[in-house]
Structure formats: structure tokens, C-alpha cells
Amino acid sequence: MTDLLFQSDSYLKKFETKLINVDLESRILFLDKTTFYPGGGGQPCDMGTLSSNHVNFKVEKVKKQGDDILHYISGEVPLPSIGSPMIGELDWDRRYKLMRTHTAMHILCGVVFRDYGASVTGGEMELLKGRMDFEFATLHADLVHVIEKSVNLEIDNNREVRVKILPRDELHPLGKT
């Protein structure tokens, strides 16, 4: 089981960890803790580096499997042995752009739900761009401009952003307050 550091500190860029398992064939490292987000819900995973004994390993992909986070390593450098201490470091430019995009998409979802009662049915994001699907029968260009203006007004309000991990059944009441 991997301790998910990103859930308590999304600004953590560098961390110390220990290698707890290795899949040599697939070049996957299992760590006791990580700040690498594995992706999910339309959001891409983090990338960066892991290092051990002054050897750097590029993290190309991160996935969640059960209670574990899998860190896929590129290259042909021999992998460290189980129990080795490691240092992880995020590609911070990528993470920060994903964070900004993620927050903007939450603002969009909040405005659309508050003003039109339409829920999100799907979405996908990349660095500084994203797509959201809403429960609208039809969506005209004029309405898109009205929504965009409302979203920009919310951004201009410069509200504090707080991170909370809630069960799904507690989410909708937040949109009605």
C-alpha cells in the first residue's frame, strides 16, 4: 500500500521514499509513499524522476492498481534493489499546469451546476486545456459565452482554493449552498 502524499500536500515537489517492490520485466517501481498523482477522472498522471545512489530514473507513467501506485521507469539503467532509499521529484511545470487546469474545470462545473443545474457527465484534461460534457439537451454558442463570462467573474473574485476529499454523496449539497 502506497501512502498518497499528493492528497495532503499538492505543492510537494520533492520527497523521500523507500522502494518496496520491483517488476523488473515491466520496469515498474512500487514505493512506500509518493507524491506522483496516478491520473484518473480524465486527468493525466504526473511525471518526473526518481533517484537512488546518484542514479536518476525517468518516471514516464504512473498508474493506480488497487492500493498501490505503479511508477513506470524508462531507460536501460539497472533498477535499485528492494529496500533502497529513493528521492522523488515531480516535473513541477507539468504538475502546476495540471493543477491550474483542474481548478479551472472545477470552477466551470460549479458555475454550470449553480446557474443551470447541469451536472458533468464526462471530461478530459491536458496541460492548460480541457473538455467537459454537461447534461444539456442543447448548448448554443450564446450560452457558451454567458457561461464563459460567469466563470471569468468567479476567477476575478480570487477566492481561496481549499482541497477536500469527500465521498461522492456529499458533493451535490455543496453546489446548492
Language-model segments: what does each one mean?
Residues 1-177:
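Active-/binding-site microenvironments in catalytic and ligand-binding cores
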